[in-house]
Amino acid sequence: YALFHLVTVFPLSWIQLYDTRPVESFLLVQMGGAVLAALGILASGYIADKVGRRTTLGTLAPPIALFSVFVPSLIDGGTTGQNTFILVGFTLLGLSYGQAAGATTSNFQKHFRYTGAALTSDLAWLVGAAFAPLVALGLSANFGLGYVSLYLLSAAVATLAALSLNRKLEIRD
């Protein structure tokens, strides 16, 4: 969920504070990115039907980790770099977001399954992403954009760890 705010709220703040690009033009690119995210959500459903939700999420964590390496050069790379950051980031977001909540359903007994998954998803959103824009802006302002890369990388690693734990805790009905 950290990726969500790192391609939506954080870059708007960063552009407003540290770049000369008009925020309005950046918002147009974000709207295009939102379309890519929506297509990614649909594609993730198709992919997950073939290989499973956890496998889909686990397969997407390494590309998100790789993407994190390029955060500084893309955000600080002028209009082309920033647009690439948004479009690639939203695509990865859509592909992973589509399966995030559903991947936890197997951890709950049948009659608690969807309530448990909803609560887990909401809490993950709050803990994993609620402060992401503020943390990313603070890191970039005080230490440089490279620390935003480390932040996103830590989220990808945490995803892989959580998926591993999720598999071990799966409840079979």
Where are the language model's segments positioned?
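Multi-pass alpha-helical transporter architecture, strongest
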Residues: 153-173
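Extracytoplasmic gate region of multi-pass secondary transporters
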Residues: 1-37, 129-132
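A membrane-interface helix-boundary motif in multi-pass transporters
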Residues: 138-154
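C-terminal ends and interior cores of transmembrane alpha-helices
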Residues: 62-77
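Cytoplasmic membrane-interface "Motif A"-like loop-to-helix N-cap segments
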Residues: 50-61
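Interfacial helix-cap and linker-helix signal at transmembrane-aqueous boundaries
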Residues: 16, 47-48, 135-143
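Intracellular juxtamembrane helix-capping segments at the cytosolic ends
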Residues: 96-108
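A late C-terminal transmembrane helix in Major Facilitator Superfamily
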Residues: 111-140
